[in-house]
């Protein structure tokens, strides 16, 4: 894939709530010129129906070829986006999904690679950090071309929550959630700022915002998925738009800085896991990680989060079905 290619092709694997919402976001924002949607055989007609339904919006947006795809259609795609997986149920953590979704992930990645695909994988199925790692292993692709959605949605939730608390536009809030996309994630308070003004300084001019309120705010961000799942059964709109944003950064070779599941090679004392941190992303995938200088407490949280992910990966890879991939 090159940044000069004019016809941009995306293949979506998984046409559930997240996948179909992502497809709608691509159509609505005019991203890519071709979108193929892959589903399991028993749901193929749903993909056909969604492709038809989405095509009826094109007169209002921009031209795009949309169709129910097969794995061989991945061969010349720029980007394969994986949203397929068992959904998270009420009371279930993202890490509880590992066993079910690793098997699904292996089947998908094996078939995509067999098509001759040589683009970029973008993973959104949960637990996303673990499944980004498994996609890397099962594909044998360079780590730069395997990307997880990471903490992109968590960071957006954090920015929106701070914006509401401080009565400012969320686009003027610059703040990150790092670590696992899940229970061990953490807020990078030390570098949060409003239009370049450090949050601590900004709060000096803001009445009635106490530290306890900020802690509660973060907890609301961390637990947002559970809240939504308990109320409506699933989360999909926020992550769909996050995926569309990542897709645009890749297809347009933006070199945008986004918080993604990025392979760790010693930054923050962490190695051999994919975990959420900011990174520069463009047409060839991850250009480089952006290593925010965390304070000691934040560094410890990053290491603890990575340790949890590593334990899950180590346990999963005891399964003989997945051990062969470790040799890649």
Swiss-Prot record:
Q: What is this enzyme's EC?
A: 1.1.1.27
Q: Name one GO biological process term.
A: lactate metabolic process
User: Where is the protein found, in the record's own terms?
Assistant: Cytoplasm
On the tree of life, the source organism's domain of life is Bacteria
The protein's UniProt keywords, in alphabetical order, are: Allosteric enzyme, Cytoplasm, NAD, Oxidoreductase, Phosphoprotein
Enzyme kind, highest EC tier: oxidoreductase
The active site lies at 181 (proton acceptor)
Determine if Transcription is one of this entry's keywords.
no
Q: Kindly list the GO CC terms recorded for this protein.
A: cytoplasm
Which residues are noted in the entry as substrate-binding? Answer: 88, 94, 126-129, 154-157, 235
Pathway given for this chain reads:
Fermentation; pyruvate fermentation to lactate; (S)-lactate from pyruvate: step 1/1
Give one GO molecular function term: L-lactate dehydrogenase activity
Question: Any known activators or inhibitors?
Answer: Allosterically activated by fructose 1,6-bisphosphate (FBP).
Q: Where does beta-D-fructose 1,6-bisphosphate bind?
A: 159, 174
Reaction(s) catalyzed by this protein? (S)-lactate + NAD(+) = pyruvate + NADH + H(+)
Residue numbers bearing the Phosphotyrosine modification: 226
Residue numbers binding NAD(+): 18, 39, 46, 71, 85-86, 107, 124-126, 149
PANTHER family with a match to the protein in the record: L-2-HYDROXYCARBOXYLATE DEHYDROGENASE (NAD(P)(+)) (PTHR43128), L-LACTATE DEHYDROGENASE (PTHR43128:SF16)
Q: Which family does it belong to?
A: Belongs to the LDH/MDH superfamily. LDH family.
Q: What does this protein do?
A: Catalyzes the conversion of lactate to pyruvate.
* Quaternary structure and partners: Homotetramer.
Name the HAMAP family for this protein.
Answer: Lactate_dehydrog
Protein name as annotated? L-lactate dehydrogenase
Which source organism does the UniProt entry give? Streptococcus gordonii (strain Challis / ATCC 35105 / BCRC 15272 / CH1 / DL1 / V288)
Q: Which gene encodes it?
A: ldh
